[in-house]
């Protein structure tokens, strides 16, 4: 179960405490059955509404909304969010919220039309980072006051490092560098592999292992990364974990976190790495610059810059004291800024609900 799913579960829990009922709608059934079970166990409800057309989706959402005394509708990650919001308007739903999780691109006239129309019919447009908010407002022609930043959050945790190293059979005598990402090129896993090539073959640094957590939504993307790994002759330095539900455990076993994304709204994995008290090397894109304080909780680098990434990894590999120092600051920073319960409570204010 990912960080966002845990955020929704906490939202459901808080709503139930206030006497409200959360219905989570999907266009396809979620892969993680634990997520569905956890939602149901705390009074939530899951509905699968396949998307066939905007008109069909509008009718389906309108029918669902009219079955309940619906006070708010909130769309996430949804290409069909526009029709859902229109259905809410037709049923006079008071609070209509959309959340932008990625760094929006409003470089074309068409994209500006789409975002402006969506913002027009919402009562609030939430962005998960200030960088996303700024990008959105720069492309809007009206309604900029509706756009606000609401950070996501992660639940605090603690796992014994030695126990986690043993549990996942990680090398005791090597620095473990974690990366949590799908294998989409936007996440920059290929950049990480090329930086490993520099570390091993140019800098002669070999006392480390990359722990890559995630998978390919498209198998061809994963195959391309494995081919690159073979071409660079770095297979001995990469451990491919795949998609798992126990990311915090693995992060607790590692020493450094690396997020070389080409674009990013904000990274829940960086928040979790910080709670594991390890420093992050991240690119200066989107919300990463808000979750990593350069020189304090980690190191920021330019995107696509494999040399900077290799240099930053070398710097932290060679300094245990700095890793520990940055990790402690990172943990405190995450607990203050990205606390799950308080950030969910902030979200509920946009539904007209005050805890």
Question: How should these model regions be labeled?
Answer:
Residues 294-295, 299-306, 315-320:
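Conserved acidic donor-binding segment of nucleotide-sugar-dependent glycosyltransferases
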């Amino acid at each position: 179960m990912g960080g966002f799913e845990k955020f929704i579960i906490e939202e459901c829990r808080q709503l139930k405490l206030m006497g409200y009922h959360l219905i989570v709608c999907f266009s396809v059934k979620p892969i993680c059955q634990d997520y569905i079970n956890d939602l149901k166990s705390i009074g939530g409800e899951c509905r699968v509404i396949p998307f066939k057309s905007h008109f069909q989706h509008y009718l389906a959402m309108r029918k669902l909304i009219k079955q309940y005394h619906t006070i708010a509708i909130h769309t996430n990650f949804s290409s069909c969010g526009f029709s859902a919001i229109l259905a809410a308007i037709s049923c006079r739903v008071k609070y209509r919220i959309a959340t932008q999780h990625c760094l929006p691109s409003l470089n074309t006239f068409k994209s500006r039309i789409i975002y402006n129309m969506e913002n027009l019919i919402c009562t609030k447009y939430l962005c998960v980072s200030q960088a996303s908010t700024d990008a959105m407002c720069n492309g809007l022609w009206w309604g900029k006051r509706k756009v606000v930043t609401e950070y996501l959050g992660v639940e605090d945790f603690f796992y014994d490092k030695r126990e986690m190293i043993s549990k996942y059979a990680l090398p005791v005598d090597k620095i473990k560098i974690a990366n949590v990402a799908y294998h989409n090129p936007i996440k920059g896993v290929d950049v990480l592999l090329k930086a490993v090539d520099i570390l091993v073959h140019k800098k002669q640094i070999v006392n480390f292992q990359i722990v890559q957590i995630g998978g390919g939504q498209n198998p061809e993307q994963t195959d391309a990364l494995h081919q690159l790994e073979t071409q660079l002759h770095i297979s001995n330095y990469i451990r491919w974990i795949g998609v798992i539900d126990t990311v915090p455990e693995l992060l607790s076993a590692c020493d450094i976190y690396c997020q070389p994304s080409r674009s990013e709204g904000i990274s829940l994995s960086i928040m979790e790495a910080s709670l594991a008290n390890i420093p992050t090397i991240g690119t200066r894109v989107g919300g990463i610059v808000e979750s990593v304080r350069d020189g304090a909780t980690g190191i920021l680098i330019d995107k696509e810059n494999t040399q900077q990434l290799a240099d930053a990894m070398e710097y932290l590999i060679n300094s245990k004291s700095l890793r520990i120092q940055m990790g402690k600051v990172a943990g405190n920073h995450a607990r203050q800024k990205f606390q799950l319960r308080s950030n969910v409570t902030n979200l509920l204010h946009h539904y007209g609900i005050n805890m």
